[in-house]
């Protein structure tokens, strides 16, 4: 294991304040020899809520990662239920830990069934699909929406009330452990656990600790089969090139 472990943490949206909040949670969980470096995509949605946002976010994060020129030992992807983790594993030669997967795996060590509390109802399907792909969906009792958008979580009192109510519904559905299904909920983990009287797993903290463990064990993504390096070919990244007439292509909203 290196003397100092450097972990990149990528926000899935363009809101810098949320990146800072995520990194504060990551640093609180990290060991004394770990440096946390936060990254915010240059383009994409201000908050990821729904399929369009998720796919746009994934492309923006991959576009960001391909140009990182500073050394790092692992990547934490801080978008709960968002797309892109498989692409990042192809792209990078270091361990890639997604907060959705990390939280679910740790929750399975603490109880037989876990529940997820998330933001809007429209995000539940994405989270269910992500858990299924990760192989941990069979232990999920429920994915429950709070009804709050990602940016609305900044109102701490309102967020706490909504998360606690959703957590109680997940417990009634059979959850023995609760997973916070948005990186913007990180700061509330201890209060929610106390209010509900059950273990609560924060995905950011879980992902950081798993990333540290993988680095310490000298393990990284397998290149056999699924996550082989991308094929060599021409790819057009980011914005479209200027046309031969010197004009940009059509504007996009």
Please report, for each region that a protein language model flagged, where it lies by residue:
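Short hydrophobic/aromatic-enriched beta-strand-loop microsegments
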Residues: 94-101, 137-143, 198-205, 221
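Active-site rim beta-loop-alpha module in soluble metabolic enzymes
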Residues: 125-183, 188
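Short, structured coil segments at secondary-structure junctions
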Residues: 32, 91-94, 110, 139, ...
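Periplasmic-binding protein-like
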Residues: 9-10, 72-79, 174-183
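Glycine/small-residue-rich loop that forms an oxyanion/phosphate-binding "nest" at active or ligand-binding sites
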Residues: 58-112, 116
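Short, glycine-/small-residue-rich phosphate/pyrophosphate-handling segment
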Residues: 17, 108-146, 157-158, 213-253
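N-terminal beta1-alpha1 ligand-phosphate binding loop
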Residues: 5-29
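N-terminal beta-loop-helix "entrance" segment that forms/cooperates
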Residues: 38-62, 151-156
């Amino acid at each position: 294991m290196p003397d100092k472990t450097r972990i990149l943490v990528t926000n899935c949206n363009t809101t810098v304040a949320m990146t800072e909040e995520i990194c504060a949670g990551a640093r609180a969980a990290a060991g004394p020899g770990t440096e946390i470096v936060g990254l915010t995509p240059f383009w994409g949605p201000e908050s990821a809520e729904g399929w369009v946002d998720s796919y746009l976010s994934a492309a923006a994060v991959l576009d960001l990662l391909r140009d990182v020129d500073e050394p790092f030992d692992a990547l934490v992807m801080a978008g709960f239920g968002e797309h892109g983790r498989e692409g990042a594993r192809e792209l990078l030669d270091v361990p890639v830990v997604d907060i959705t997967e990390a939280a679910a795996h740790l929750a399975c060590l603490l109880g037989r069934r876990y529940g997820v509390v998330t933001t809007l109802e429209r995000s539940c399907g994405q989270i269910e699909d992500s858990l299924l792909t990760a192989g941990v969906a069979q232990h999920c009792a429920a994915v429950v929406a709070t009804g709050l958008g990602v940016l609305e979580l900044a109102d701490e009192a309102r967020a706490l009330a909504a998360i606690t109510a959703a957590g109680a519904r997940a417990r009634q559905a059979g959850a023995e452990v609760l997973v916070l299904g948005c990186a913007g909920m990180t700061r509330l983990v201890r209060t929610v656990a106390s209010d509900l009287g059950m273990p609560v797993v924060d995905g950011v903290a879980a992902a950081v600790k798993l990333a540290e463990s993988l680095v310490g064990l000298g393990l990284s993504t397998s290149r056999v089969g699924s996550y082989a390096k991308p094929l060599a070919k021409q790819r057009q990244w980011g914005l479209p090139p200027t046309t031969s007439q010197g004009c940009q292509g059509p504007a996009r909203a």
